[in-house]
Regions:
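Alpha-helical tetratricopeptide repeat
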Residues: 1-205
Length: 205
């Protein structure tokens, strides 16, 4: 794919789109610095390129350059304030920075725009748990499960929340459902073993 975009750029270097899509290809290959260069060129050619700002923010985030990511998300929101994904992405960066209240607010904005974003429910559940809003976190997990009954992440996170409140039987039930969706999930296998241990059901470990 990168070679194809190289050829297009060689012939039509004045177009912003080939730089943007080559940036996406580099982002998928974990070449974050290369992606940033291409997104920056796309923005130079088209200063109102919303998606270039948003994905450059993602690349900055992956390089742990959170201030740069936040600046790009802010610019993207100024250009397109009704896009759910840019709020969800900014929430991820805010959570990494430890600003859980801001992250919760952005996940909520994303879900107001698009109420079917499973990842936003799960990410909001994580920050709500950190903000000691156990009931809110549980509600978000349940909303995610309603949208995707085969989400091992949703069942696994809800199982963890049950475990935190010593609701061991409910935790086991959710971990079992998570493992039914993905039997190879080692993290959930270990979590279930911890619950069995707490319940003194040692043979199950």
């Amino acid at each position: 794919a990168i070679d194809n975009f190289n050829n297009i750029i060689w012939v039509k270097p004045y177009l912003s789109e080939p730089y943007f899509f080559r940036g996406l290809a580099k982002l998928n290959l974990d070449d974050y610095e290369g992606a940033i260069q291409d997104y920056s060129k796309a923005i130079e050619l088209n200063p109102n390129y919303f998606h270039a700002y948003m994905y450059r923010g993602v690349a900055w985030h992956n390089l742990r350059k959170y201030e740069e990511a936040m600046a790009d998300y802010a610019q993207a929101i100024a250009l397109e304030p009704r896009d759910a994904y840019v709020y969800a992405n900014r929430g991820i960066t805010e959570a990494e920075m430890g600003d859980f209240k801001a992250a919760e607010k952005d996940y909520s904005k994303a879900l107001m725009i698009d109420s079917k974003l499973v990842a936003a429910y799960l990410n909001r559940a994580v920050v709500r748990e950190k903000l000691d809003d156990w009931e809110g976190a549980m509600a978000d997990c349940t909303s995610a499960i309603r949208l995707n009954m085969f989400s091992d992440d949703a069942f696994g996170l809800r199982g963890y929340l049950w475990f935190q409140h010593k609701e061991y039987h409910n935790a086991i039930e959710d971990f079992n459902r998570a493992l039914k969706a993905n039997p190879e999930n080692k993290r959930i296998l270990m979590s279930r073993a911890m619950v069995w241990y707490e319940m003194k059901k040692y043979p199950e470990v």
